[in-house]
Design a protein with these regions (language model features):
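Cysteine-centered nucleophilic/redox motifs
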Residues: 135, 165-181
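N-terminal accessory/pre-domain segments preceding catalytic cores
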Residues: 1-145, 157-161, 171
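Acidic/histidine-enriched alpha-helical segments
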Residues: 154
Length: 181
């Protein structure tokens, strides 16, 4: 057991060094993200493992661009589901990169999830909440497509689409992925 713990610890250190180097000038953000999570010097907590999984999901560019708010939003949202779901399924469902396409990195996960639960899924049985058809139908009815409003083709953030209910097709698609995750 101690040998396994030492192996985990050395793997963690190696990964963290790689993240810090890859983040270039953004290393302080990663350190600030990881600092409150560290429980014991010689142990690896589940929260640390989830944080490392999130960092692993980031592209090289996102390691340089990501903010502390985005990382914390991604880490702290869905924690209640952690205990209920098998690890590999949890990673596939919830630990996707915060950036979906080429939109700005913004902390949207918690606010969007709460908003969708209160509106889109309010009258939907639990068994249907993971059915993408429910969200697709809601998007068709509630989000107006207007490609002319976004002449520079800069994607609107998922929360921007949620609040405006108007978007170009690409921003609507990014919103759908964010909402479904």
């Amino acid at each position: 057991d101690k040998l396994y713990g030492n192996t985990l610890q050395s793997e963690k250190k190696e990964k963290l060094v790689n993240f810090l180097v890859a983040s270039r000038g953004n290393h302080q953000t990663l350190k600030d993200f990881l600092s409150p999570i560290r429980k014991e010097k010689d142990a690896v907590s589940w929260e640390e493992i989830r944080a490392i999984w999130i960092l692993e999901s980031l592209s090289a560019k996102d390691l340089r661009d990501v903010t502390l708010d985005v990382l914390n939003d991604h880490l702290l949202t869905n924690i209640s589901d952690w205990e209920k779901i098998e690890t590999d399924l949890f990673k596939r469902m919830y630990l996707n990169p915060p950036r979906i396409a080429n939109e700005m990195l913004t902390p949207y996960k918690k606010e969007l999830r709460e908003a969708i639960e209160k509106t889109v899924y309010q009258s939907v049985p639990d068994s249907m909440k993971r059915d993408p058809k429910v969200l697709i139908e809601w998007c068709r009815k509630e989000i107006k497509i207007n490609n002319e409003l976004n002449s520079q083709q800069i994607p609107i953030s998922p929360m921007g689409v949620w609040k405006a209910r108007v978007a170009d097709e690409k921003s609507r698609d990014i919103f759908f992925v964010a909402a479904y995750r």
